[in-house]
């Protein structure tokens, strides 16, 4: 069965994210001297939707601000790519702590909460959304509380607790790694620090050997893995990009987050060899666009990308939408998990899908 999606049915304003999508592009500081306001953006889109779409396409394919050498986010991302998103010492440390806490048994949430209380004298408190408006978590050292919004689901709550434990117990190791990266700005260092702290939290929730063994035993069945480790699809996808331990390597996935306009919000290459910003693939028939028409469904697709490469590679992609707990701005995103097509026969979700033709939606 193939999903029913006609890209020609999209209006141009929908394909570029409407006024919001166009306004975001116009807000680039390269255009700051022009003083373009929202009303002008609306007029441009209404009067010349095809021209607006052409501008958006050129903007997205140009060297974005995130790729500038002096851009903190781009600098931090390139540092992560040098490690192939695998931080061996911290991964081992998180695995040892997971074993110590016996996170494979019983209620994981209880074990994490007890660690906070016994080692750090911190309690975890769930607060009404109106008490922490716009926030999903807050550390109140005066009250000795990690305060979490009621808007967070179970997986998100466990992640926030694990992240706080990572920050408290591995701060020195994380700081040493960040300082050793030789980044040029405090902002870039903070971005890398946040990423590595998230990494440790995920490694605590999905300890390396146990997680890799489950991946191999289930043929990387994403549905089973989400249930077995009680994590979200987003958390699972990020962890799958990290499996590069020497002698115990997993499959080389990349992970990308997109908004409805197809604008890339986040990209993690892992060891996949995929190159940001996935040149040659931004077009409506690619699977991230279709996920918004089939909310929550896991869609699959074989594609080719690698514009400018001598031999563009074939990839297998899995994608679905996610809802971000308690965060309005990114309330709906598409996550794409991908790896080279030559590895796809090792995935449960690829079974029964023909390798060709490419650039068409799969079952």
Language-model features: locations:
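Short juxta-domain linker segments that transition from a proline/glycine-rich
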Residues: 2-363
